[in-house]
Amino acid sequence: MIFPDGSEREIPRAGPASIREQVRLVFLAAATGADILVSEMMSIGAECLAAESRRILQPGTLALTNVRLDHLDEMGRCKDDIARSLASAFPERADIFIPKEEIYPAFEEAAARTASRLHPVAPLPTVVEPGPGPPLSFGEFEPNVRLALAVLASLGVERETAMRGMAHASPDFGSLRAWRGRFGDPPRPAVCVSAFAANDPESSAAALLKIGREFPSHRRDAGGNSPHVSRWWVGLLNLREDRGDRTLQWIRAAGEGFFRDFARVVLLGRPAPAALRKIRKSPPPGGTSFSFYDGASPEALMNRAVSAAPGERVVIGLGNIVGPGERLVRFWDEKGTPHDP
């Protein structure tokens, strides 16, 4: 939680995350005299989304970032179904902001049904620049920036003020971040990038586009070819035992060539051995080497990740941040130096 004075506090949890946390948040916002409450809805499934948004928060402004194939068992197996699940969160007579390219018929139908105003946010005509002061964080994506600017403009916040606030904001633990450092035994130079929280292959592909512009792979530079680049991508794909549908997505993505720009990919988590067997049954295109690691030491894993590759290594975390992903991010944060583009 972030308070009006800029201070932060962890949300206390006695058990798993619950939408009931939003009830406490509303009471806390009222008790502190906040003028505006900004809350992230993380519900999965149409019924929970409807309860969280329409019964508890009842927002006057709702921002929806994208429609992605994730949590398929609860949200739906195709994007139209997922859009219908997300549309269940539309409150009555609210302003709904969505990137223009993410508009689905279900959103238009829900807006009409709830008497809400749908605002498709078109891509910005020019590159987003924060103006005077520090640049935006490496982890900021253009659709999210334009969405935030549109919402803030509707609330009377000037663009320069909004950009300055975003540029000075501390990145979330799970945001796209990069560190430089020396890892392994003997120490070797490496860039470590956390894209763990992107979760699904489509969101991760968007993150890889940003990563590729900053740290081109030895197999491809920003122009598509890189025979002279000695920078090797090594993927650390963290798989969760309770996200079987997501693991299957990653297995399919591997078979379709998702990792063709990677020299090596190391699978992590309990599903890793079974997932590796599936992947090896139909070797993915590109000649990428796949293996798994079942230890718990970030240091030992990094030693393995940066070994046996010439040039600079770019170690990219994908899949999920829970468990091994979180341990790696904390290790990189402790041992590395944050990369500022």
Which residues fall in each region the model found?
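A generic structural signal for well-ordered alpha-helical segments
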Residues: 29, 110-112, 283
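A short, gly/pro- and small-residue-rich
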Residues: 54-65, 85, 327-341
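Adenine nucleotide phosphate-binding catalytic loops in nucleotide-utilizing enzymes
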Residues: 11, 72-83, 87-90, 94-202
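ATP-dependent carboxylate-amine ligase catalytic core
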Residues: 1-62, 66, 70-83, 105
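Active-site flanking residues adjacent to catalytic metal/cofactor-binding acidic residues
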Residues: 39, 64, 98-99, 194, ...
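Conserved beta-strand/loop subsegment of P-loop NTPase cores
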Residues: 61-66, 93-99, 263
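Hydrophobic "anchor" residues on beta-strands that sit immediately upstream
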Residues: 36, 61, 95, 191, ...
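ATP-dependent carboxylate-amine ligase
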Residues: 154-157, 164, 169-341
